[in-house]
Amino acid sequence: DPFQCLAVCINLSEAVRSSSPETSVSHIPVHQDGSCNGLQHYAALGRDKLGAAAVNLVAGEKPADVYSGIAARVLDIMKRDAQRDPAEFPDAVRARVLVNQVDRKLVKQTVMTSVYGVTYIGARDQIKRRLKERGAIADDSELFGAACYAAKVTLTALGEMFEAARSIMTWLGECAKIIASENEPVRWTTPLGLPVVQPYRKIGRHLIKTSLQILTLQRETEKVMVKRQRTAFPPNFIHSLDGSHMMMTAVACRRAGLNFAGVHDSYWTHACDVDKLNRILREKFVELYEAPILEKLLESFQTSYPTLLFPPLPERGDFDMRDVLESPYFFN
């Protein structure tokens, strides 16, 4: 934002010109952002070492870029496919066309929306738009085929790098489907004790006839939307966890005398308190995930619906959550 940039420039120039820059007063909120925060929460839930490294839950010499990491995997797959015989593997031709198009920008939107359960069709349309912007493939049918192939490869790469995230996402969706099939909305309680209910119900139409006209009213019925309950639960559950992390951080900042503001995975404080906020937000993330979150969720489902059979919890890795405390790029 140009005005934010201007404000920082003015503030910085005042400090530099001051006889004592270190005591110069600054009211600028300094932002610290998560690294693909939804995937950070999935990696923590799954104790996934590979996923944790990709989204900066562990220390590194430089920030890990999950989008570049996925792009590199996609490129490797396409290079292998390009070597195959088109007579046996028709996508080999598409791979040869796309190897020069694969970059961070091509896959970024799909990686970002993977946390929200992006479908194959959604990924295909996202990648098709990126390819169309570049004008690399003129023929519409060839563009569509290339987008289909690229979407399939991108989702494969995501599944390989974030295997634990995919299994947890699937498990959450299956639990939601089982509950919604009983015409019940999915309910859960966040780690901070906030009860949540997914409000998705089918819409009914009611006709009201008057002497002048016929009015149609749309109102929710008692019938829940099974598909939407299933697809919405994984992202909604993750959002309830990132909201819990923010609230825990905000409360700790208040107790420590820090000014705090934030939007989603962007936490703000004044320049003099950046190091303190860094420490607090890491400590609260570790505290959040040292609790058995998925175990408690399954237990609550089994208690609320004792006659229903839920799938077992997905397998998890052995990532040490306390590594987050030493990761400089977890939020930066």
Curated annotation (Swiss-Prot):
GO terms for biological process: mitochondrial transcription. One of its GO terms (molecular function) is DNA binding. The active site is at 33, 108, 265. The keyword Transferase applies. PROSITE patterns: RNA_POL_PHAGE_1 (PS00900), RNA_POL_PHAGE_2 (PS00489). Gene3D superfamilies: 5' to 3' exonuclease, C-terminal subdomain. Its EC number is 2.7.7.6. It catalyses: RNA(n) + a ribonucleoside 5'-triphosphate = RNA(n+1) + diphosphate. It comes from the Eukaryota. Keywords: DNA-directed RNA polymerase, Nucleotidyltransferase, Transcription, Transferase. The keyword Transferase applies. DNA-dependent RNA polymerase catalyzes the transcription of DNA into RNA using the four ribonucleoside triphosphates as substrates. This is DNA-directed RNA polymerase 2A. The gene is RPOT2-SYL.
